[in-house]
Amino acid sequence: MEGETAAKAAASSSSSPSRYESQKRRDWNTFLQYLRNHKPPLNLSRCSGAHVLEFLKYLDQFGKTKVHATACPFFGQPNPPSQCTCPLKQAWGSLDALIGRLRAAFEEIGGGLPESNPFAAKAVRIYLKEVRQTQAKARGIPYDKKKRKRPHTDTATPIAGDGDDAEGSGGAALVVTAATTV
């Protein structure tokens, strides 16, 4: 009975892909169309991180996020009082999610070694980081990566004993000392 249920679930999931899988397929097809329309047309095997960056910049023309230029009087204001002529661009979160889906799609089609995945290129990661920082500054909400606080560490040092764990027998014990950081 359980096997039938699992088989039905697998069949239904294979007949109608999840929202994520559908979006991933649409994104992949859009990227392949971009490569075909590129001058000169590009083959996926020759695609590099630089081509991915061109694609991301191409997508900016379809963006809906106002990104104030540094010369704009509203630069750094989270809620500007009126309209300006600054460009609309793709939001960083959208680009980040897109790259994640395209990276997964590339791996699924067997695009080669993970090192050859153009969506995982260092230049793409750097570009996304710059977009995130630029958009945060333009909105007046600077993105500061939270630094991990060093936890108060206790160090444990064993004290030699006879190895017997019975109470009061002089067995091995741990002495905990608080480490101080200066």
Swiss-Prot record:
Tell me, what does this protein do in biology? Probable transcription regulator that acts as a developmental regulator by promoting cell growth in response to light.
Q: What cellular component GO annotations does this protein have? A: nucleus
- List localization entries: Nucleus
> What name goes with this protein?
Protein LIGHT-DEPENDENT SHORT HYPOCOTYLS 5
**Protein family (similarity comment):** Belongs to the plant homeotic and developmental regulators ALOG protein family.
Q: Where is this motif: Nuclear localization signal?
A: 145-149
Keywords, A to Z, come to: Developmental protein, DNA-binding, Nucleus, Transcription, Transcription regulation
Q: Which PANTHER family match?
A: PROTEIN G1-LIKE2, PROTEIN LIGHT-DEPENDENT SHORT HYPOCOTYLS 5
Species of the source? Arabidopsis thaliana (Mouse-ear cress)
InterPro entries under this entry? ALOG, ALOG_dom
Query: Which Gene Ontology terms describe the biological processes this protein takes part in?
Result: mRNA transcription; post-embryonic plant morphogenesis
Q: Where is the composition biased (Low complexity)?
A: 1-16
